[in-house]
Amino acid sequence: MLIHPRAEPEIAFLLAKDLAGPTSVTGVLAATEAVFGAVDILDSRYQDFRFRLPDVVADNASAGRFFLGPRTCRPGELEDLRLTGCVLRCDGDVIHTAAGAAVMGHPAALVAWLANRLAERGEHLPAGSLVFSGGLTAAVAIRPGHAVTAEFDGLGTVEVFA
């Protein structure tokens, strides 16, 4: 059961091989087997998502659920992930529009950032990891009965019913 869910569109990366830092967007793309359009459902037991770092860790980083789009492609099949457009709709109404560049300039930049932080601890992202880019738009509050749709250029549509 979700408490007060929010939805945000993201781009997900499925790693074909281990990814260790130091790395960059280029390294992430070379290690990626497939990319997906995705919708991340955030939820938190903390009222209005107000919490401190220890709280968010205890709350599993507000992770609720995630949904992957039906179409996958290799990174090179899309001209430039920075230009991958996204339209987020709720019950058919356009709520937000964005492009992949909304996340740190490139959606793979967050994956590189994560691999580099893990490398500082002597760790890495193993092959088979599914890593989300972070929200392309602000998260949108959803209620039971809402239909949330994220349409991605080249990656298809993800539809979620709350």
Residue ranges and their predicted role:
Residues 1-106, 147, 157-162:
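Catalytic-core "active-site belt" of small-molecule-metabolizing enzymes
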Residues 107-139:
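A conserved acidic, glycine/proline-rich C-terminal tail/linker
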Residues 136-140, 154-157:
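Short, charged beta-turn/beta-strand-edge "cap" motif at the junction between a beta-strand
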Residues 139-149:
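Short glycine/threonine-rich loop-to-helix capping motif typified by GTGT followed
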